[in-house]
Amino acid sequence: MIKNIAAVMLGGIVGTWMRYGVMISVSAEWLLWIVNGVGSFAMGVLNGLFATTSKYARWKLFLTTGMLGAFTTFSTFSASWLKLMEHHELRAVIYAVLMTALCVILASFGYLLGIGRKKAGERS
């Protein structure tokens, strides 16, 4: 249990550093889209790779729950949505639908890629 908590915490530290690196490199307007899109795709790939094994459970916790959980940012997405809702209701709805759709689609593609790579590796 303690090792699992440590894996999530250490992954969270790495993910936070990664997001900070993107924050200082990319304009604020596109930051959330890039972070959540890349993070969702990576989450899908990793979940695909880890889908049929519990052998690397701590690595999965480190990479998915910890690192990518800290890298992506649902709270900032929610705050941005609320700010848009104050004056631009239609724009806020479009923003929420597009962000959610983008992340789900990228996570799905990532998962298919990850599970496909895993199956290809098992055949070799």
Predicted regions and their residues:
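Membrane-interface helix-loop junctions in multi-pass transporters/channels
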Residues: 1-124
